[in-house]
């Protein structure tokens, strides 16, 4: 049986991307093979992986088993019997954190730039007196939601088995959610699973979000989503909240940016209203907290959030967190909080691939009731790779230019509308600039990028530069090879695959690549 699994794993590794193999196949464990019953049993480490492997890979694994034993073999996927031991509840460490003076926190909170103007306060929770008291004491600013924004669209959640398709299974019928519910929760009713474009970059995060929305407090608690700016983290957590509200409009849900949570802690301290503050946050059914990295260095805020987190988990309430980086890479956050973040499911959201970027543009254009030719969408998607917000901004420029000049949207019109943006992109993201940036970063000479030298301190940065050239420019593999001293395209392909595979395993390398990408993108 072990010989079979070794051979099957090798075959699957050659068929799948490194990330797919590492995420789905590597964690599986062959348990037994019954020759009389022709039954192979394979264990998955948790329910999420079990369901996904059964829906996505069971047929291929069964086919490999039949070929190996040269007979019909049934494959049974089960939950790892030792999974429960690994999921044992962590005991809360109640020793107080080092306290930072609240005056200092107040200054830090005020120093953080706010992206949105001050907004009027909305009505507090009416269901519970404690919620009303907390709102009054903390003087929490709640964004106004225009009544026209309350979407009447259906809330359909695609099944995890078909992550690349928008739409799918319908949610159970539910009473309409009125505006005041969204005002209390701070949820944006426009951000749903229905209008989230799904691709390889976010399919795992979306599948986890769907699972949590259907089983709050039971599946993956907390759910921790991380990735760069504009990749859809906020959209996903709003979609979870909106789905839960459709099923239960009386659910106590709160979306809050970490910066606002810091401000609430400061206000509660100033008004001596911590009891009300705690009663409110500890009584929620779902807490959605965005950009948790803003807690860095704010010890009193971390203290209060720790107690809120413990209370919510103990009450089987769901906690969902987003950040721009992996939990253990956040600086200035207490270790016991980091361990809590790591105790659930942590999922990365990557920049969208080409096909997903095209789908996003077409979806956004459809929402604007504008027809954008597919070749235009591909042109934009090929040149803009960073995130969804960048794509949205480019589309707005194209539409504005087209309307102002009274021209149909073509590639020529698009090129003219985006000429400034494309000039910046082409100037910044060139192979030559990548080579210089990598050489400076790793303290080698630019000439080493073209040389035939093979010491590790030179070969490694050169491979990283090749990887970035493939990811961030439009150059083909032969063109990149030519710019790296006339190397063969297979050498470039080897470097790209090697760095891509190691990036998914090596946190330090991933951090270095993130820094280089941000430097190159300006």
From Swiss-Prot:
Q: Which SUPFAM superfamilies match?
A: P-loop containing nucleoside triphosphate hydrolases (SSF52540), TrpR-like (SSF48295)
Q: Which Gene Ontology terms describe the biological processes this protein takes part in?
A: DNA replication initiation; regulation of DNA replication
InterPro entries from the entry?
Answer: AAA+_ATPase, Chromosome_initiator_DnaA, Chromosome_initiator_DnaA-like, Chromosome_initiator_DnaA_CS, DnaA_C, DnaA_dom, DnaA_N_dom, DnaA_N_sf
Intracellular or extracellular location(s) = Cytoplasm
Region of interest called Domain I, interacts with DnaA modulators, as start-end residue ranges on this chain: 1-71
Q: What is known of its domains?
A: Domain I is involved in oligomerization and binding regulators, domain II is flexibile and of varying length in different bacteria, domain III forms the AAA+ region, while domain IV binds dsDNA.
The record's listing under NCBIfam families reads: DnaA
Function comment: Plays an essential role in the initiation and regulation of chromosomal replication. ATP-DnaA binds to the origin of replication (oriC) to initiate formation of the DNA replication initiation complex once per cell cycle. Binds the DnaA box (a 9 base pair repeat at the origin) and separates the double-stranded (ds)DNA. Forms a right-handed helical filament on oriC DNA; dsDNA binds to the exterior of the filament while single-stranded (ss)DNA is stabiized in the filament's interior.
Protein's name according to its UniProt entry: Chromosomal replication initiator protein DnaA
Organism this protein belongs to: Ralstonia nicotianae (strain ATCC BAA-1114 / GMI1000) (Ralstonia solanacearum)
Gene from which the chain derives: dnaA
């Amino acid at each position: 049986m072990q010989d079979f699994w070794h051979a099957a794993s090798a075959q699957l590794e050659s068929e799948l991307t490194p990330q797919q193999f590492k995420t789905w196949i590597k964690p599986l464990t062959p348990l037994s093979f019954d020759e009389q019953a022709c039954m192979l049993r394979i264990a998955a480490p948790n329910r999420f992986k079990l369901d996904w492997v059964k829906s996505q890979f069971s047929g291929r694994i069964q086919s490999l088993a039949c070929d190996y034993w040269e007979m019909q073999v049934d494959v049974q996927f089960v939950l790892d019997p030792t999974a429960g031991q690994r999921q044992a509840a962590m005991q809360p460490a109640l020793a107080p954190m080092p306290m930072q003076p609240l005056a200092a926190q107040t200054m830090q909170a005020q120093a953080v730039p706010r992206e949105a103007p001050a907004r009027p306060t909305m009505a507090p929770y009416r269901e519970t007196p404690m919620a009303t008291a907390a709102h009054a004491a903390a003087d929490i600013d709640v964004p106004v939601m225009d009544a026209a924004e309350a979407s009447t669209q259906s809330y359909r959640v695609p099944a995890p088995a078909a992550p690349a398709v928008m739409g799918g299974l319908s949610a159970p019928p539910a009473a309409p959610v009125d505006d005041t519910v969204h005002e209390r929760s701070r949820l944006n009713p426009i951000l749903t699973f229905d209008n989230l474009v799904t691709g390889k970059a976010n399919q795992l995060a979306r599948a986890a979000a769907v699972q949590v929305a259907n089983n709050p407090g039971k599946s993956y608690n907390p759910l921790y989503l991380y990735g760069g700016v504009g990749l859809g983290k906020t959209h996903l957590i709003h979609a979870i909240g909106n789905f839960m509200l459709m099923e239960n409009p009386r659910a106590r849900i709160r979306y809050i940016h970490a910066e606002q949570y810091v401000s609430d802690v400061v206000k509660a301290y100033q008004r001596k209203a911590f009891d009300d503050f705690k009663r409110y946050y500890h009584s929620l059914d779902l807490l959605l907290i965005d950009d948790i990295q803003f807690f860095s260095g704010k010890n009193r805020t971390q203290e209060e959030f720790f107690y809120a987190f413990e209370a919510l988990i103990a009450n089987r309430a769901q906690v969902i967190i987003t950040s721009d980086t992996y939990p253990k890479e956040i600086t200035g956050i207490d270790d016991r909080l980091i361990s809590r973040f790591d105790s659930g499911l942590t999922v990365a959201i990557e920049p969208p691939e080409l096909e997903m970027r095209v789908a996003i543009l077409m979806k956004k254009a459809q929402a604007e009731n504008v027809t954008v030719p597919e070749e235009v969408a591909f042109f934009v998607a090929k040149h803009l790779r960073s995130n969804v917000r960048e794509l949205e901004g480019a589309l707005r420029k194209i539409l504005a230019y087209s309307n102002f000049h009274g021209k149909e949207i073509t590639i020529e019109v698009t090129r003219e509308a985006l000429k400034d943006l494309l000039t910046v992109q082409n100037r910044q993201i060139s192979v030559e600039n990548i080579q210089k940036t990598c050489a400076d970063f790793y303290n080698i000479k630019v000439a080493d990028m073209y040389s035939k030298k093979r010491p590790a301190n030179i070969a490694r940065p050169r491979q990283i530069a090749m990887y970035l050239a493939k990811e961030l420019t439009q150059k083909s593999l032969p063109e990149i090879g030519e710019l790296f001293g006339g190397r063969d395209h297979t050498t470039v392909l080897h470097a790209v695959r090697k760095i891509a595979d190691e990036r998914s395993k090596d946190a330090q390398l991933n951090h270095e690549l993130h820094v280089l990408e941000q430097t190159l993108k300006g």
